[in-house]
Amino acid sequence: MLERRCRGPTAMGPAHPWLFSGPSQESSQPNRGLRYQGKSVAQPGGPAPVKVHRCAHCRKRFPGWVALWLHTRRCQARLPLPCHECNQRFRHAPFLALHLQVHASAVPDLGFICHLCGHSFRGWVALVLHLRAHSASKRPITCPECNKRFWRQKQLRAHLRRCQPPAPEARPFICGNCGRSFAQWDQLVVHKRVHVAEALEEAAAKALGPRPRGRPSVTAPRPGGDAVDRPFQCACCGKRFRHKPNLIAHRRVHTGERPHQCPECGKRFTNKPYLTSHRRIHTGEKPYPCTECGRRFRHKPNLLSHSKIHKRSEVSAQAASHTGSHLIAAEPMAQPALGVPLGSLRTPAEAPASLHSCTDCGRSFRLERFLRLHQRQHTGERPFTCTECGKNFGKKTHLVAHSRVHSGERPFACEECGRRFSQGSHLAAHRRDHAPERPFVCPDCGKAFRHKPYLAAHRRIHTGEKPYVCPDCGKAFSQKSNLVSHRRIHTGERPYACPDCDRSFSQKSNLITHRKSHIRDGAFCCAICGQTFDDEDRLLMHQKKHDA
């Protein structure tokens, strides 16, 4: 909020002389929150460029530096993280950590210094990671295995499932050949294929008999067999490897060790490539582009699965463009060039269908499990239940994303402003706020928007559509927020309470109007001429005279 009392420029102290120096004056003090050295933007039809003044906190732009200064005071008052040295406020902890090193370090060469313990770091990312160690001591729940601390018992249970090796009684399926145990039946079935392959190799060797003397074959086994080719053997299951790093990575299957930890969300992995692939979720990196449509993917298997869609469409197009007249030869040849009779060759139209189709909507899927997941949309089945609130979900990924609402986890961070999100889709939508492009254009008036839902809501102004109907009185609204606000009339809900008295309101605008009654006369003071106003809006209107 704006300053409640008129103290004048001199009452601010000599520490902030740059607040009252105009754009033409130079100041050695670095700007805190103000950026009046904005880019010059030429107005269409005007000869001289106009400077753009941008707020460093919310990126809003203002035509004059006075309006920017007034806005910055209100913007900083709403920020949750205050600096205890100079009372400046910040929205995100990394920005506060960057600011604190100005107070903590008198010598710039020391780098980034922790204000709690005095440790210095070369980069601010290392300082932010170090600050987490101080906050970790306040977490009440401790892991009995690795002493890692958590805020909630649910986070500890999820952590124990990752870091604790499974107990012997949790592996009831035992292989009869080597004695290795497994937690699931399908894992044992996959493992038994190793012994089947070994038995087939032995039977083939006995049937072929000893190799003739002479020059050994390229594929002839060396003396000692696997002991020479694969000298590194696992002491738990007897599996052999050619290289020692492969054996070390394999041992983690038995020990449950996960040494590679994600610095963003704390999830651990057995191999570094798994961690590298996982970190792309936080960074948003998608290094695998499709050469057909340009769509990008985070993992290579996803790209390979996507490319099959284009291949199937090409096959369907070829089958539709060709007719049976030139696919069938007049006189079938006895032996084509490839050595296969033409009668045994199948055209793309005759190829067996390997897709699984939905009986309700006709949509096809490559795998049956994808079809089962899709059919839950028609049946309404929601087998995954949240243990905290009992809400049901049709997909496990939706349950995992929902659980972050209870745990408070926000693993997806914006590189521009540091704001964190619980879902990657929310981060992708937020990134458009930083981008200058507005790809969604209204065909009626030409107004552009960054997000498609904003365009859909705007178009209802032209069409007059009101899809949101109140179930109590039947009144219709074009925006869902208007319906939510209207329903408080029927429910009697008043979520906006005045902090100065006991009154509460159903609309936020009514609360803002009411709070002006608590403000004393002359509470809002102009920093340029000293004139006072009872209303903040009147002060802003007055400031436009100075900007002009």
Curated annotation (Swiss-Prot):
Protein name: DNA-binding protein REPIN1
GO cellular component: chromosome; cytosol; cytosolic ribosome; lipid droplet; nuclear membrane; nucleoplasm
Domain of life: Eukaryota
Zinc finger regions, C2H2-type: 53-75, 81-103, 112-134, 141-163, 173-195, 232-254, 260-282, 288-310, 356-378, 384-406, 412-434, 440-462, 468-490, 496-518, 524-546
Region (Disordered): 1-47
The species this protein was found in: Rattus norvegicus
GO BP term, pick one: regulation of fatty acid transport
PROSITE patterns in the record: ZINC_FINGER_C2H2_1 (PS00028), ZINC_FINGER_C2H2_2 (PS50157)
Gene Ontology molecular function terms on file: chromatin insulator sequence binding; sequence-specific DNA binding; zinc ion binding
Residues found modified as N6-acetyllysine: K39, K272
UniProt feature, compositional bias: Polar residues: 22-31
Subcellular localization: Nucleus; Cytoplasm, Cytosol
Keywords, ordered alphabetically: Acetylation, Cytoplasm, DNA-binding, Metal-binding, Nucleus, Phosphoprotein, Repeat, Zinc, Zinc-finger
Tissue specificity comment: Expressed in the liver and in subcutaneous and visceral adipose tissue.
Listed Gene3D superfamilies: Classic Zinc Finger (3.30.160.60)
Membrane-crossing segments per the record: none
